[in-house]
């Protein structure tokens, strides 16, 4: 198994797909996806385009769907939800499909959707992702950060490092043997420095500051937890994620 970390979807190799792609958008899309599925959501379907989301979701009965839209950190007008995982309670999401479009996370998922296996990862479900990698041993693994509008993101890179760090620890293989690019080593180093204060890291991150200005402190606190959910969101058909416990 070789791990490759890409800081944004735009940095992934063109005309290639890996055996397993892991999309990361800690703040907040992949944290929300894991939360919805853990709370009993039927599925999460991701869209880059809001108009397409509305058109596809119209085919579903209102009682079986939820629409979540976020642009610039704020909720899209007319949608039931924004991108806060804390709004995704079992009472609201159980048995329903969440149709979601966000500024960054859904772009990363669209880029890798043709990979043989596509997973979503956040700190909250890191252990489930690592367990899958160790059990299945895919040959080439991309961990793709969502970034912010094409730019580097501290929190996504730290999460990529958290995954790689745990794979190294549990496989007892040296990092240089698992690392397919230098970004893996730097991501592990970033996570190692901040693993005991991820909330502090979020406060330094540009998107963390953006969410704090929107008074989303509790979201940051929730998303900074590690290994609190056992859910593994896995793509069942293009753009549609269901749980693998």
Curated annotation (Swiss-Prot):
Its EC number is 3.1.3.71. Keywords: Hydrolase, Magnesium. Disulfide bonds: none annotated. Signal peptide: none annotated. One of its GO terms (molecular function) is 2-phosphosulfolactate phosphatase activity. Transmembrane segments: none annotated. Its cofactor is Mg(2+). Pfam families: 2-ph_phosp. It catalyses: (2R)-O-phospho-3-sulfolactate + H2O = (2R)-3-sulfolactate + phosphate. Belongs to the ComB family. This is Probable 2-phosphosulfolactate phosphatase. The lineage of its organism: Bacteria, Bacillati, Cyanobacteriota, Cyanophyceae, Nostocales.
